[in-house]
A protein has these predicted regions:
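Membrane-core helix-loop-helix motifs of multi-pass transport proteins
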Residues: 2-8, 170-257, 274-283, 472-495
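Short, hydrophobic transmembrane alpha-helix segments
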Residues: 25-35, 53
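Transmembrane helix-bundle signature of multi-pass membrane transporters/permeases
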Residues: 65-66, 146-152, 166, 183-194, ...
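Membrane-embedded alpha-helical segments and adjacent helix-loop junctions characteristic
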Residues: 76-182, 344-445
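Interfacial loop-to-helix junctions that mark the boundaries of transmembrane helices
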Residues: 9, 31-37, 90-102, 217-225, ...
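Alpha-helical transmembrane segments and their helix-start/interface "positive-inside/aromatic belt" motifs
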Residues: 5-15, 44-62, 142, 179-187, ...
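Hydrophobic mid-bilayer segments of alpha-helices in multi-pass membrane transport proteins
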Residues: 14-18, 38-80, 104-113, 228-233, ...
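Long, contiguous bundles of hydrophobic transmembrane helices that form the permeation core
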Residues: 2, 7, 231-318, 329-353, ...
Length: 495
C-alpha cells in the first residue's frame, strides 16, 4: 500500500514539475506569438509524453490541458486569470454544454445502463446453457465464442464480460485453455466494435470530431480498418482449423491434458455477479436487436427520412448525437418494460441498474471530456495550422502520415492502457491538420480520403494494443476476458 502511495505521489510531483517548467519558460522568455508555432504542440506533446511515462491517462490529459491554458494566457497577456478562463470556461464548461457532446454522453450512459440490465436479466446464462447442450468439440466451442462476440457488438466491455461468463464453462468442458479463450474474446470484441456503426466506439469517435458528421466519418473509416478485418479472419481460421502455434500451442497442449490454466493456482478466478434464474436466450437477443433498430430509426429520423429523404442520405446527414441518444433512451424504456413484463427483473432492480450503468461509464466520460478540452486548447493555439504547414511542406511526410499515426497510436495505447484515451488525443490533432479540407465538406459532401485513412490508422493502432499489451492495466484485461472477474471492469473501461 505504501509503495502504491509513493507511486501516485511521484506521478503527481512529475506532473507539477512539467507545469512549473512551462511557467518558468514563459517567465524567462515571454511568449508573444504562440499561435501557429511550435509552442502550439506543447499541450498534446505533454499529454502524450506524460501518458507514456506514467501509464496514467487522466492526469496526463489534465496536465496537457493546463499547460495549454498557461501558454494561451501568456500569449494573450491575460495572466493566471486567463489560464483558468481558458481551461474551465472555454474548455470544460463549453464542451460539457455543447449539445452534440452531451448527446454522446447521454448515449454512453444509457448504453451502460442497458449493459447492466442485460447482465442481470440472465439471458447470457440461458444462452450458455443452450450452447453447452448443443456444441460439440473444440472447434464448435471456439466458433461459438466468436459468433457470440460478433452478436454483441454494441460495446467491447459488455462483449468481453458477457462472452467470458457465458463461454467459460463451455470452453473448459472442451479443454480449451483460458489463454486461448482470452485471445478469442479480445480478438473479437474491439475489432467488431470499431467496424460497427451502432456501438460505443462509434459514438466516442464521432464525439471527437468537429465540423463534419461524426457517424458518417466513422462509417467511411470501416473499409480502411484492415486491422479489424484481418484479426477477425484470423480468429475464424484458428477456430475452424483448431490450429495453434507459438506459446499458445504450449497452453493448448497442456489444456488437452486437463490443465486449462497452465499454472498451479487460479489467481484470477472469481465469482461472477449474480443473475436471475428466469432468463432465456431471447432476453439476450431481443434487447440487442431493439437497441440497434431504435438507434438506426433515431438517426434516420434526425436525417429527415420520415420527411421524404432516402435512407442513405438520411443516415449520412443525421445528427448522430441526438439520434443515438433518442434511440437508446427509447430502447431503454422498451427493455425495462419487456424485462418487467417477463418478470425476470423487478422495478427496483431496474432502477438500481441506472446508477450502476452510469458508474460503469464514468471513466469513458472523463476521457472524452478531457480529450475535448485538450482539443480546445490546441485550437486556441492553432496547432492544426502549424502541423498542416509542416506536412504540406514535406510531401513524403504527408504520404507517411497514416503509418506514423498508426505507430504512435500503438505506442501510446500500449503504454497507457487506454485505447479510448489514445484516439481521444490523436483524432483531434488529425482533424486540426485537415481543417481547411474539412471546412469544404458541407459544400462538397465528400470527406477527404486522407482524413479517413488517418483516422482509421488511429483507431487500428488503439485497438491493436488492446490485444498486444502485457503491461498493467491491459494485461489484466486479457486475463479477465477469460475469467470474467468482478475487477475486470476497471481494466476494460480504461480502453
Amino acid at each position: 500500500m505504501e509503495k502504491k502511495k509513493k507511486s501516485y505521489l511521484s506521478k503527481a510531483v512529475f506532473g507539477l514539475l512539467i507545469v512549473a517548467f512551462t511557467v518558468c519558460c514563459i517567465i524567462a522568455a515571454p511568449i508573444t506569438e504562440a499561435k501557429g508555432t511550435l509552442w502550439s504542440l506543447f499541450p498534446p506533446v505533454i499529454a502524450i509524453g506524460l501518458a507514456l511515462i506514467t501509464k496514467e491517462v487522466y492526469s496526463s490529459l489534465f496536465v496537457g490541458i493546463l499547460s495549454g491554458g498557461i501558454i494561451y494566457a501568456a500569449a494573450s497577456g491575460t495572466g493566471f486569470e486567463g489560464t483558468f478562463k481558458a481551461v474551465v470556461q472555454d474548455g470544460l464548461i463549453t464542451n460539457l454544454s455543447n449539445a452534440y457532446n452531451v448527446g454522446i454522453l447521454v448515449f454512453l450512459v444509457v448504453l451502460g445502463i442497458i449493459v447492466v440490465l442485460m447482465n442481470k436479466a440472465g439471458g447470457s446464462r440461458a444462452y450458455g446453457e443452450w450452447a453447452a447442450a448443443h456444441i460439440k468439440g473444440r472447434r464448435g466451442a471456439a466458433l461459438s465464442t466468436f459468433f457470440l462476440g460478433v452478436l454483441i457488438f454494441v460495446d467491447d466491455y459488455f462483449n468481453c464480460l458477457t462472452v467470458g461468463s457465458v463461454m467459460r464453462p463451455i470452453t473448459d468442458k472442451h479443454n480449451i485453455s483460458r489463454s486461448k479463450l482470452a485471445y478469442l474474446i479480445d480478438s473479437t470484441a474491439a475489432p467488431i466494435c470499431i467496424i460497427a456503426p451502432i456501438s460505443s466506439w462509434a459514438a466516442a469517435v464521432s464525439g471527437t470530431v468537429e465540423g463534419v458528421n461524426g457517424i458518417s466519418l466513422f462509417i467511411n473509416t470501416i473499409p480502411y480498418n484492415l486491422y479489424a478485418f484481418l484479426t477477425i479472419l484470423m480468429v475464424i481460421f484458428i477456430s475452424a482449423s483448431d490450429t495453434d502455434y507459438g506459446p499458445m500451442k504450449i497452453h493448448e497442449d497442456n489444456a488437452k491434458n486437463g490443465d486449462i490454466f497452465t499454472t498451479q493456482n487460479n489467481t484470477y478466478e472469481q465469482d461472477a455477479q449474480p443473475v436471475t434464474e428466469r432468463g432465456r436466450v431471447i432476453d439476450l437477443i431481443l434487447p440487442v436487436a431493439v437497441l440497434i433498430v431504435l438507434c438506426v430509426v433515431g438517426m434516420i429520423y434526425t436525417g429527415g427520412f420520415f420527411s421524404g429523404t432516402d435512407f442513405v442520405t438520411a443516415f449520412a446527414n443525421c445528427d448522430a448525437a441526438y439520434g443515438l441518444s433518442l434511440g437508446s433512451i427509447s430502447a431503454l424504456i422498451v427493455i425495462i418494460a419487456y424485462y418487467m413484463f417477463r418478470r425476470v427483473l423487478k422495478f427496483n432492480e431496474c432502477m438500481d441498474s441506472i446508477a450502476a450503468g452510469f458508474k460503469q461509464m464514468v471513466p469513458a466520460i472523463l476521457i472524452l471530456t478531457f480529450a475535448w478540452t485538450l482539443k480546445t486548447m490546441t485550437n486556441h493555439l492553432e496547432a492544426g495550422a502549424f502541423v498542416s504547414g509542416v506536412v504540406q511542406s514535406a510531401t513524403a511526410l504527408s504520404v507517411l502520415l497514416p503509418v506514423i499515426l498508426f505507430v504512435v497510436a500503438i505506442g501510446l495505447a500500449f503504454a497507457t492502457g487506454t485505447s479510448w484515451g489514445t484516439f481521444g488525443i490523436l483524432i483531434p490533432i488529425v482533424t486540426s491538420v485537415f481543417d481547411a479540407e474539412l471546412a469544404n465538406v458541407s459544400q462538397t459532401g465528400e470527406i477527404p480520403s486522407m482524413v479517413i485513412i488517418c483516422i482509421s490508422a488511429c483507431l487500428a493502432g488503439a485497438a491493436t494494443t488492446v490485444r498486444l499489451s502485457r503491461t498493467p492495466p491491459l494485461w489484466h484485461r486479457q486475463v479477465h476476458s477469460a475469467t470474467t472477474s468482478i475487477t475486470f471492469r476497471h481494466s476494460c473501461r480504461m480502453r
